[in-house]
């Protein structure tokens, strides 16, 4: 088997995992989730921060809070993880895929500008 990624566990991680298992808080709540949310609040200076179970859930929450619905088109790079497109699809919006630059693998700004010029008013 070729591993997708090799875990890098050092420092206090073993103790943190043991704490979670000992307390029974191994999912979406508990002291470490609260500490993480507070740290994000302090770091970003926002009033609220919510930890999500995965990136897909975070994207879905973000799209929902932005008011994205079936009347919208969401632009995304064509080179992305499937969760990006799944979250957009779940919102009901249409997806417009824009190709990426060969040298950076980021969305090609020229193609984006062309798409916007031809598809928006």
List the model feature ranges, each with a label.
Residues 1-26:
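N-terminal "arm"/small-domain region of PLP-dependent enzymes with the aminotransferase-like
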Residues 29-73, 87-91, 97-99, 118-119:
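Phosphate-binding glycine-rich loop
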Residues 79, 93, 100-102:
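Active-site loop/turn elements of alpha/beta-hydrolase fold enzymes
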Residues 80-85:
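Conserved coil-to-alpha-helix start sites within the AMP-binding
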Residues 103-121:
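Active-site phosphate-binding strand-loop segment of PLP-dependent enzymes
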């Amino acid at each position: 088997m070729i591993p997708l990624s090799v875990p890098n566990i050092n420092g206090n991680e073993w103790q943190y995992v043991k704490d979670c298992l000992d307390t029974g808080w191994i999912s979406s709540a508990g002291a470490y989730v609260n500490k993480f949310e507070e740290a994000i609040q302090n770091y970003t200076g926002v009033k609220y921060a919510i930890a999500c179970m995965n990136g897909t859930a975070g994207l879905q929450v973000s799209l929902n809070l932005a008011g994205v619905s079936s009347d919208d088109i969401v632009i995304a790079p064509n080179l992305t993880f499937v969760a990006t497109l799944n979250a957009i699809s779940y919102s009901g919006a249409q997806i417009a895929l824009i190709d990426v630059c060969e040298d950076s693998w980021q969305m090609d700004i020229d193609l984006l500008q062309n798409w916007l010029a031809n598809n928006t008013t």
